[in-house]
Amino acid sequence: MTPQEFEKLKTAAKEFFEQTGLALEVEIKNQADSTIFVDVKAEEPQFLIGERGQTLGEIQRLLRAVLRRKAENPTPFFIDVDVNDYKKKKTEYLKEVAQTAADEVAITKKEKELPSMSSYERRVVHTELASRPDIATESIGEEPERRVKIKPRP
């Protein structure tokens, strides 16, 4: 993505959040892996995060659709929106839960299923545990009840 294209998308993203009417600080960064990271600081974050981050997920999908329409260049890019470090904290929590569950599976040699999670949350767990040679992970179930199963490796 060119610097000019990024500036155009950055402006569109700021306008998107200005239309909420909420008191927000929005910082937008272009990351090396074609990801546009949108960091939002809000006085009332609950309106943007929602229950279990569902509103935040929908805002991210809507913003992605808006920016893809504004993009002149068909170069693919990703959008990552975080509000008051909600996703950052959630990711750290998920990594901790994943490692704890994996340790339990490695010791007991019994499978363990984690609670239902969004696709983003499942990806965090799979990525966190991918380098462990003693366990394997797989997603099971149907949306919205999809979850991660952690299994011992022989």
Go through each PLM region and give its residues.
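RNA-contacting regions in translation and RNA-metabolism proteins
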Residues: 1-154
